[in-house]
């Protein structure tokens, strides 16, 4: 009779990764699980940073780096990452390669969905746990095809300051501007979902997702972005006479577009900061022309005037920020400047969390 190994079996599929962040008494974060397989690579470190959080139970954040060999994804690459934050843990997720490159998909008559690169991320966040996910932007090369799905499951049984918290940045550029690329890829699809877990199973498996079919969840937010040229390059005629880019028309005049999602008590001040910044912007028709009051002095241009953005509160205090800028440098300066001006991320997670900005 074969003896069953007490150790977890290795990941079978290429590109899969699993991370479980636990907390050892009294408040020492520890990665109880960290596995990955080519072409995915996961690196971690504990920074020399002591959080100055208002929460006395806040633990020291752990940094996780998501990398891929070659700095990008080839056609057919499938990345699947599962992350679990057990109660009171804090995790910073970044991509230290400068950008996530999406390499070209070669045109072929028999092209299928498997020819495009794909990335899936699922994160489970326990009570009083916090995720700060600030990756570098995606850079889709000309003729590339890419899809990503990011799912965040938060514990909805906790109330007040014990709720889960998350900050998620998702942004994409027009391509390699140094080579003249300007939204010349075929497809970029991104979907972000936040689910509220109403009835988690009262054991460790509830955080690892082993009993997902028994869980009671409800959708808090679903945000999708589809950039599709709506053309087929599988025929010689289409390749020789490429149509005008629909993606370029729809994103003009922006060279970068992105989404920032904020939820939970750790990012409550940051959420209010973005909403207040947006509501303070001048509006067309806001001036009372019947008044004899002198016109306001025109303020000098700043990064708020160089970036188009909106900020709105949705259900359960979640804030959704959408932004667009002419180029990556402007977007970085605006977003990085705003996050540093408010100060929550640097205070709770350290300045290293803002490395992509």
Residue spans for each PLM region:
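Beta-strand elements of well-folded, non-transmembrane domains
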Residues: 23-25, 85-87, 99, 127, ...
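N-terminal, charged/glycine-rich beta-strand/loop interface patches
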Residues: 2-138, 142
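Residue-level recognition of well-ordered beta-strand positions that form the cores
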Residues: 20, 65, 82-84, 122-124, ...
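Broad gene-expression machinery/nucleic-acid interaction feature
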Residues: 14-18, 61, 78-80, 118-120, ...
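Short, solvent-exposed loop/turn segments that connect beta-strands within catalytic domains
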Residues: 27, 159-162, 200-204
